[in-house]
């Protein structure tokens, strides 16, 4: 090979590579323009994507996806079936977020506790609502919550992207009817009595069967605010509860974490979660965790 032949061959190779690159670029532009950038998705006769699972579609909160959900009330408890978390993974995610959020309020500096948390019912409302949101960077900045390990999010739906909007809690009696989505049957606020009667159901009066995320309810007769609640959780693997004491004689309450054995041995018998205590209503569970479809 002569000294001039080698550079000439390299030039030919370079030109060939450039030509191939341009050809590939033109081909991709042609496919994009004529295909309009669409992905191939099989659709039903109604025009809705058939490839998306119900859970995945529901997470987008579109009118079409919610129309495919069951607007029924299998248990007649006032909660629509489209809100029930039927996937065990979703149930576990909700329980983890619900208890983590509630417990965090009890260990953070008092000045950082959200101002809306003033009693036991408000702790339930706040933790329930926040557990069902999307937990992205914006959420962490807004709540000031810091976690070492983050659970997965609920996938079925997220607050407030449902037909109920921001109105999360059932406040009217009766089974769910489709018109309840807009007639005031649901609201953003519900007191402890309404939470236990309209948004949760009795599981047992044996506290040993309670799971993290379950609720303990009491009715202390003779008090101006007789309904009280606690959230079942774990402290270092041991059963425990977290709750807000609420205002007492003009003095603001405080958030407490108590191991279950200590609660069972409470110096005031009316607070012991035992079947023989008439003030203890039992272990309750949120309606959205009730049964499977």
What does each model-identified segment do?
Residues 9, 35, 44-47, 176, ...:
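Intrinsically disordered, low-complexity regions enriched in polar/acidic and amide residues
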Residues 49-186:
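N-terminal capping segments
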Residues 148-251:
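...with weaker cross-activation on analogous glycine-rich loops/strands in unrelated enzymes
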Residues 240-293:
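Low-complexity, Gly/Ser/Thr/Pro-rich intrinsically disordered linker/tail segments
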Residues 14-29:
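Hydrophobic membrane-insertion alpha-helices, especially the h-region
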Residues 32-51, 57:
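Ser/Thr/Pro/Gly-rich low-complexity linker/stalk segments immediately outside membranes or between
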Residues 1-9:
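N-terminal Lys/Arg-rich, disordered targeting/topogenic segments
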């Amino acid at each position: 090979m002569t000294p001039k032949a080698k550079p000439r061959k390299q030039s030919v190779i370079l030109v060939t590579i450039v030509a191939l690159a341009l050809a590939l670029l033109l081909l991709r532009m042609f496919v994009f323009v004529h295909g309009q950038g669409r992905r191939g998705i099989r659709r039903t006769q109604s025009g809705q994507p058939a490839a998306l699972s119900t859970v995945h579609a529901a997470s987008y909160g579109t009118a079409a996806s919610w129309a495919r959900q069951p607007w029924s009330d299998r248990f007649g408890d006032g909660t629509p079936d489209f809100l029930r978390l039927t996937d065990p993974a979703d149930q576990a995610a909700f329980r983890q977020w619900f208890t983590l959020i509630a417990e965090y309020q009890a260990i953070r500096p008092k000045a950082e506790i959200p101002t809306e948390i003033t009693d036991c019912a408000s702790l339930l409302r706040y933790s329930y609502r926040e557990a069902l949101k999307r937990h992205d960077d914006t959420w962490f900045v807004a709540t000031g919550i810091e976690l070492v390990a983050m659970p997965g999010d609920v996938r079925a739906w997220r607050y407030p992207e449902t037909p109920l909007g921001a109105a999360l809690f059932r406040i009217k009696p009766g089974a769910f009817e489709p018109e309840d989505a807009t007639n005031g049957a649901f609201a953003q606020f519900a007191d402890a009595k309404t939470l236990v009667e309209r948004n949760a159901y009795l599981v047992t009066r044996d506290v040993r069967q309670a799971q993290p995320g379950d609720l303990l309810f009491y009715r202390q007769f003779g008090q101006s605010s007789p309904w009280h609640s606690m959230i079942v959780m774990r402290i270092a693997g041991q059963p425990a509860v977290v709750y807000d004491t609420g205002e007492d004689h003009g003095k603001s309450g405080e958030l407490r974490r108590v191991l279950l054995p200590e609660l069972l041995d409470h110096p005031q018998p009316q607070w012991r979660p035992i079947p023989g205590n008439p003030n203890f209503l039992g272990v309750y569970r949120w309606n959205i965790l009730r049964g499977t479809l």
